[in-house]
């Protein structure tokens, strides 16, 4: 059984390795795939129990974009977007204004009469997004929407999705295997392994305090800092790996110990980033006080009390 609590007007990610079941889960949310057991509820409706007209109506409230765009190559950009509105039964007189409005939103107003073959990969994905949100959906499903794009284009697509989430109030469920995607735009994340959700919660909390071994492994790839063996073996003093979370990353902790205890502080490796405007980082530091070893011990204790975690690498 897979259970994920959906929060309205949220940006939720599903993260896992290939074969974990991420895309299959996403496809159950609009009944493209039926669950072998259990129920799928979207917007309070058990979509897994619907069929025929009721299912078609429910799907009109759920947009979807794909990894490889799935555009109709013989139709223009405007015609691709208009197709979804015609399928939803829009009045002919209202389709053209809505198409123009949505193409302006996604930055393609000047590409309305172009064909997909004339577009870049990022522009094709913008058409896919425009088509998916044209009918005012409540939920937008995104199946690895940036995996076929370069880093710069991916960033612009993610920024557009965040804009749509904030401006239109659409709940976005995004499937990805890229940790940077989750950190940059998502509010919540569900981590999948072996067809099961092994952990879920606020994105910052999952990076700062991963509970499941699989999540810890994923997070370690982005935060792990390794020193060359030469430094680990030959540098004097104590080597510490310090985890900073939230406010502790904004405090002059290392300056304090240098002044208060008279120890020399040498930063050997480090990384601090911001997830949802909250700081998360790791520093590897060397503490030395050749003529006062007790000062180093006191400095380590001071750091422990003011940061999230301290690991003594050596010393």
Swiss-Prot record:
Family matches, as SUPFAM superfamilies: ACT-like, P-loop containing nucleoside triphosphate hydrolases
Q: Which residues bind ATP?
A: 16-23
Gene3D superfamilies reported in the protein's UniProt record: 3.30.70.260, P-loop containing nucleotide triphosphate hydrolases
- The organism of origin for this protein: Salmonella enteritidis
Q: What class of enzyme is it?
A: translocase
Role played? Part of the ABC transporter complex MetNIQ involved in methionine import. Responsible for energy coupling to the transport system.
Q: Which UniProt keywords apply?
A: Amino-acid transport, ATP-binding, Cell inner membrane, Cell membrane, Membrane, Nucleotide-binding, Translocase, Transport
CC per GO annotation: plasma membrane
According to its UniProt record, the EC number is 7.4.2.11
What is the similarity comment for this entry? Belongs to the ABC transporter superfamily. Methionine importer (TC 3.A.1.24) family.
Q: Which Pfam families match?
A: ABC_tran (PF00005), NIL (PF09383)
Kindly provide the name given to this protein in its UniProt entry. Answer: Methionine import ATP-binding protein MetN
Record note on quaternary structure: The complex is composed of two ATP-binding proteins (MetN), two transmembrane proteins (MetI) and a solute-binding protein (MetQ).
Q: Which InterPro entries match?
A: AAA+_ATPase, ABC_transporter-like_ATP-bd, ABC_transporter-like_CS, ACT-like_dom_sf, MetN_ABC_transporter-like, NIL_domain, P-loop_NTPase
């Amino acid at each position: 059984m897979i259970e994920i609590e959906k929060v309205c007007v949220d940006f939720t990610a599903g993260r896992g390795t290939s074969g974990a079941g991420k895309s299959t889960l996403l496809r159950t949310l609009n009944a493209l795939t039926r669950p072998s057991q259990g129920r799928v509820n979207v917007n309070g409706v058990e979509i897994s129990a619907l069929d025929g007209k009721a299912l078609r109506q429910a799907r009109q409230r759920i947009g979807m974009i794909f990894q490889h765009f799935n555009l109709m190559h013989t139709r223009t950009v405007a015609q691709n977007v208009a197709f979804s509105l015609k399928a939803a039964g829009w009045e002919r007189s209202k389709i053209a204004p809505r198409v123009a409005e949505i193409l302006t939103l996604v930055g393609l107003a000047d590409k309305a009469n172009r064909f997909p073959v004339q577009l870049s990969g990022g522009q094709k994905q913008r058409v896919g997004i425009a088509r998916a949100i044209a009918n005012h959906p409540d939920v937008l499903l995104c199946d690895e929407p940036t995996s076929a794009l370069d880093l710069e284009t991916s960033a612009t697509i993610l920024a557009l999705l965040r804009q749509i989430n904030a401006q239109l109030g659409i709940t976005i469920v995004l499937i990805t295997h890229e940790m940077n995607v989750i950190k940059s735009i998502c509010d919540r994340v569900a981590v999948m392994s072996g067809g099961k959700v092994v952990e879920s919660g606020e994105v910052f909390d999952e990076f700062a305090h991963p509970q499941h071994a699989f999540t810890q492994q994923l997070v370690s790839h982005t935060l792990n800092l390794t020193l060359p063996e030469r430094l680990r073996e030959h540098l004097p003093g104590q080597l510490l790996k310090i985890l900073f979370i939230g406010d502790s990353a904004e405090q002059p902790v290392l300056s304090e110990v240098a002044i208060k205890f008279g120890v020399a502080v040498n930063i050997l490796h480090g990384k601090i980033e911001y997830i949802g405007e909250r700081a998360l980082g790791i520093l590897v530091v060397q503490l030395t006080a050749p003529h006062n070893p007790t000062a180093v011990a006191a400095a380590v204790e001071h750091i422990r009390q003011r940061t999230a975690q301290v690991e003594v690498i050596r010393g």
